Amino acid sequence: MWLGTYFGGLNYYHPIRNRFKNIERIPFRNSLSDNVVSCIVEDRQKNLWIGTNDGGLNLYTPDTQQFVHYALQENQREDGFGSNNIKSVYVDEPRGLVYIGAHAGGLSILHRNSGRIENFNQRNSRLINENVYAILPDGENNFLLGTLSALVHFNPEKRSFTTVTQESDGTPMNLQKITTLFRDSQKRLWIGGEEGISVFKQHGTSIQKAAILPESTVTKAFTNYIYEAANGLIWVGTREGFYCFNEKEKRIKRYTTANGLPNNVVYGILEDSYGRLWMSTNRGISCFNPETEKFRNFTEADGLQSNQFNTSSCYRTSDGEMYFGGINGLTTFRPELLQDNPY
């Protein structure tokens, strides 16, 4: 849209580009510590905790647009982060703690009041693998950790790690290269990663596979993200498109570029207030209407940080704002403002 002004010349306004806002690293200014964003979480104060690939952890206050950086410094490995490549974050509000999983850095705990950081690795604990890609509370004040070699149970009070080696019936647990953990509304545990997806029932420290998934390629597909919509449908983002699991109908349906998806690598999935699904891919962001099964796709030309996004790097805040992390920072927007363009 071109706008003529009295003394200001001719201005160009793009109704779509101006709906997207990007947050990026700006050298020598208070900004994002690194442009490659790997995880995003909101706390009760509506601050965002943003993990990056090489810049550690960022605490971002949207109202003031100010950042606080937490990163590994030289000669600090004994009492700081084990790595600046952050893969997962969980905020424990009642205890004022932030749990941080890293690639090649183990598990760290940030004490928000004091700023003290504890780090657990293979040298000082029984953590079997220092690549912690997912952190999930188990409902009993303990945590499950998804690592690249096993599922690990962590007891914060005892500061103890237990590798889950078998199911409760004795069946060996051979899950490796776990990249995402999810708990559905029925309290079942979903584990996804390079080797596919599995569903378990959990009771304390014991878990047992739940045979709810019908035979499908999704069980073997490299899983990036698992999401439950408000209507109870489970959506799974993979490197081979995304899948919808309808448990009532015992049916799985797959969507790919043949259906209108811009790219088959789906990194993250979020639902808006209209029931539409927003997905980050390797070719921009796609909005999918489950009722009509129609796609609306957005690219870097529409104002995104890049066409490429990152695994599990997405979050919908309590205010309805959506954030997707990519290779050039964050793209944020309110989906309700992105109405269909009639032209």
What name fits each language-model region?
Residues 1-343:
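Carboxylate-rich, polar loop motifs that coordinate divalent cations or form catalytic acidic clusters
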